A protein has these predicted regions:
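Structured adenosyl-cofactor binding patch, chiefly the S-adenosyl-L-methionine
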Residues: 66-107
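Adenylate-forming
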Residues: 40-43
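A contiguous loop/helix-start segment that scaffolds small-molecule binding in enzyme catalytic cores
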Residues: 47-48
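Short glycine-rich anion-binding loops that position phosphate/pyrophosphate groups of nucleotides
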Residues: 33-37, 54-57, 79
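RNA substrate-binding interface of SAM-dependent RNA methyltransferases
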Residues: 1-33, 91-94, 98-106
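Short, glycine/polar-rich helix-capping loops at beta-to-alpha or helix-loop-helix junctions
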Residues: 59-64
Length: 107
């Protein structure tokens, strides 16, 4: 992001297990096109983690099968359409979770 680097706390983990070890009590929702569960059907809680894959391939199968994953969820799309890009998908999901939490900390 252009001028947002000072607002981000970026940590690069060596692997998915190391990442998950930093959030031991969090529920983890994996966003994938390969499920029938929609993202807005989740009752999000403070501390939940949202996992997204890259635009080309999504989340790798071995990560989707990880025992720490709480549920696979998807953002509905119109038939015969490609997917939204990662930024738009993350924005839709994060704002839904934040909305459910009453826009906690917002102005």
């Amino acid at each position: 992001g252009l001028d947002y680097h000072d607002l981000a706390d970026v940590i690069i983990h060596p692997d998915i297990d190391a990442c998950f070890d930093t959030i031991p009590d969090s529920r983890i929702f994996a966003f994938t096109a390969h499920t029938e569960h929609h993202y807005h059907e989740v009752s999000y809680q403070d501390g939940d983690a949202l996992l997204f894959g890259n635009e080309a391939n999504g989340i790798p199968d071995e990560h989707l099968a990880h025992p720490r994953i709480t549920r696979h969820v998807r953002i509905p799309m119109l038939p015969a359409r490609r997917s939204m890009n990662l930024t738009n998908s993350a924005s839709v999901a994060v704002y839904e979770a934040w909305r459910q939490l009453g826009f906690l900390g917002g102005i």
